[in-house]
């Protein structure tokens, strides 16, 4: 399964640490976060990868160039940040019409990706995407997912005082090939725009 790793953000909440280091290269136990992602995903049989860059992009490009993953990673520089949806739309053909992962690579995650893929394969038929969630003790501090009794997302609430649950959006998604084709067909005009 192919994966797009979103790594273009400014990392403003981690300043001053990110004043000179992109958030995806901030070390955790001495290892850059992006390296942790690439190692974990590769170990689970996931790849190749597309990594978008913007802020301090030269550092990310240099890291990939010097890494063991250089042949598995396509780097796409965004002169203007496109956001999650914009990056997906602009690079939709990367998935080659198959199910694919979309990951905010500036987050740290210890989840079992094989189990996540199995959950996606066994999702209800009406679901076109599987979203990783996590339980939070402070639901008013993050984006909360509202789900029905079948585990289907029915709403989102962003940092509200009275959140409907404590399931937080983990910013990791598996997109079905059906959804990828739908996005490609509905937004093909946007794909032609010069960003």
Residue ranges of predicted features:
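N-proximal low-complexity "stem/linker" segments adjacent to membrane-targeting elements
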Residues: 1-18, 25
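Conserved N-terminal catalytic core of the sugar/cofactor nucleotidyltransferase
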Residues: 2-5, 27, 31-104, 108, ...
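Short Gly/Pro-enriched turn/cap motifs at secondary-structure boundaries
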Residues: 16, 80, 134-136, 162-165
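A short, conserved acidic/glycine-rich loop-to-beta-strand motif
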Residues: 124-134
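Catalytic-core segments of class I nucleotidyltransferases/pyrophosphorylases
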Residues: 101, 108, 114-123, 137-139, ...
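A structural signal for short hydrophobic beta-strand segments in well-ordered beta-sheet cores
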Residues: 25, 145-147
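Active-site glycine-centered loops adjacent to acidic/histidine catalytic or metal-binding residues
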Residues: 9, 106, 135
């Amino acid at each position: 399964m192919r994966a797009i790793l979103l790594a273009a953000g400014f990392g403003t909440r981690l300043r001053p640490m990110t004043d000179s280091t992109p958030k995806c290269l901030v070390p955790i136990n001495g290892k850059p976060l992006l390296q942790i992602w690439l190692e974990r995903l590769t170990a689970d049989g996931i790849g190749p990868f597309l990594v978008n860059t913007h802020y301090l992009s030269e550092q990310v490009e240099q890291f990939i160039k010097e890494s063991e993953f250089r042949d598995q990673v396509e780097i796409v520089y965004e002169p203007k940040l496109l956001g999650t949806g914009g990056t997906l739309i602009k690079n939709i053909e990367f998935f080659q019409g198959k199910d694919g992962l979309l990951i905010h690579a500036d987050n740290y995650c210890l989840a079992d990706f094989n189990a996540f893929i199995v959950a996606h394969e066994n999702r209800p038929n009406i679901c076109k995407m599987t979203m990783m969630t996590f339980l939070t003790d402070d639901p008013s501090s993050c984006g909360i997912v509202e789900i029905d009794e079948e585990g289907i997302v029915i709403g989102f609430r962003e940092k509200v005082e009275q959140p409907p649950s404590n399931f937080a959006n983990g910013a990791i998604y598996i997109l079905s090939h059906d959804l990828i084709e739908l996005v490609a067909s509905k937004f093909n005009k946007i794909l032609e725009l010069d960003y």
